[in-house]
A protein has these predicted regions:
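Conserved beta-strand signature within the Rossmann-like core of class I S-adenosyl-L-methionine
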Residues: 128-136
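A short beta-strand submotif of the Rossmann-like class I SAM-dependent methyltransferase core
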Residues: 67-73, 117
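Core SAM-dependent methyltransferase catalytic element
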Residues: 182-205
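Short, glycine-/aromatic-enriched active-site segment of Class I SAM-dependent methyltransferases
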Residues: 99-106, 136-150
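Adenosine-cofactor binding site in Rossmann-like domains, unifying the SAM/SAH pocket
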Residues: 31-62
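Conserved Class I S-adenosyl-L-methionine
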Residues: 144-177
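Hydrophobic adenine-recognition pocket in adenosine-nucleotide-binding enzymes
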Residues: 41, 73, 121
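A short glycine-rich, Lys/Arg-flanked "PGG" loop and its adjoining helix->strand segment in the class I
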Residues: 87-100, 110-127
Length: 205
């Protein structure tokens, strides 16, 4: 966010240095940019390569990245939200039909934040690419103590993107399909805070 406005998908550097080797993306870098990564945040902090609103479509093509890393970001993305229907908006833009534009606004599309995050991560990763995430778990004080935490994550969340039975519950919503490398929960610290850590791999086929 810059001067009260969300700056979406605006590269700060045209060719981030991280793209010269394996493409590794660090989502929610904040003020902790990592060397060797394309550092991404909604704010243009020092060291940020791409400013992006991750509740919208992510600014990378399909099968693009070798690794996506995120720590203490996904819980800040809304659990669900509604946006004007993108297909109707595109049709209205192409035809100039005001009735189609009104329909797009009056019939918004509901997006579930957790599903959107996982679907986009899967889309952007290359086959065999890794998603590495550390997120405050709902099983601890770490999730509930922060007033900016607005979506729910724990070990079982990842079942919906890895286990055939759970993935099949919402086939019209979930496109992501991952293999589990490791999912576990970090034991609480002295403040009762704990995190779920997940390493997931996009299948080769």
């Amino acid at each position: 966010m810059s001067n009260g406005q969300v700056v979406a998908f605006e590269p700060v550097d045209e060719q981030p240095a991280a793209e010269s080797g394996p493409i590794r993306i660090h989502l929610g870098a904040n003020q902790h940019a990592l060397p060797g990564y394309i550092n991404v945040d909604i704010e243009p902090f020092a060291g940020i390569d791409v400013v992006a609103d991750l509740e919208k479509p992510w600014p990378w093509p399909d099968n693009h990245a070798d690794e996506i890393y995120t720590a203490d970001l996904p819980e800040h993305l809304r659990g669900w939200y509604e946006v004007p229907d993108p297909d109707l908006l595109a049709a209205a833009k192409q035809t100039g039909d005001i009735r189609t534009l009104i329909e797009a606004i009056e019939k918004p599309k509901r997006t579930y934040g957790v599903i959107h995050f996982m679907n986009e991560a899967h889309r952007v990763l290359k086959p065999g690419g890794l998603l590495k995430a550390r997120i405050p778990t709902t099983q601890s004080k770490a999730w509930a103590q922060d007033p900016t935490h607005v979506s729910f994550w724990n070990e079982n969340t990842f079942l919906y993107f890895t286990h055939p039975g759970y993935r099949g519950i919402y086939p019209h919503l979930i496109t992501a399909k991952f293999d589990v490398v490791k999912v576990d929960t970090i034991m609480p610290n002295q403040y009762g805070e704990s995190w779920v850590k997940a390493i997931l791999r996009k299948p080769l086929a």
